[in-house]
Amino acid sequence: MFFLKFAAGISAVITVSFFAKTKCKKMRSEYEFFNALNEYLKSVKSAAGYKKAKISEISVENADFKEFLGNFPVTGKLSDLTAPEYLTEAEKLKIATLFSFIVSADAKSLNEALNSYISEFGGITDEKRANLLKRKPVYLKVGFAVGLMLFIMVI
């Protein structure tokens, strides 16, 4: 009987740790997307002479971009950022690739995060980057602690 309880406890620790690790991966992919998009938009801003542009002004009118975005709700005008006089075909593909980061993620939470973290070019501050990365290990620690508690309760 002891071994059965021990096995149940170990499986609880593994399960909780797995879900915590999955959450960390999602946060990391969001951070990478925000960082890549921010850097790209900075280059567009300097090339196009934009003073200010908001993510909420981006939309998808081109079918190629719709394919990358899937059902992700984006508003505004992407055509402003992909105007031929500003960007090459490679740069257009680059912004489409950046948007492809979000296709498999939860659209609602990422949409809210985009609106809150990137309201204009350079919108990701060092503090926000640090917060995203600081929270990451907490999920593993909490997940392991909860799993360990379940393990102790089972035994």
Per-segment meaning from a language model:
Residues 2-74:
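Juxtamembrane/interface alpha-helical elements of multi-pass membrane proteins
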Residues 7-16, 129-155:
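Bilayer-spanning, highly hydrophobic alpha-helical transmembrane segments
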Residues 37-40, 44, 91-98, 102, ...:
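Amphipathic alpha-helices that form helix-helix packing interfaces
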Residues 72-82, 130-135:
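Juxtamembrane/interface motifs at transmembrane-helix termini
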Residues 76-108:
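Short, non-transmembrane cytosolic segments of multipass membrane proteins
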Residues 101-145:
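Membrane-interface, cytosolic juxtamembrane amphipathic helix immediately N-terminal to a transmembrane helix
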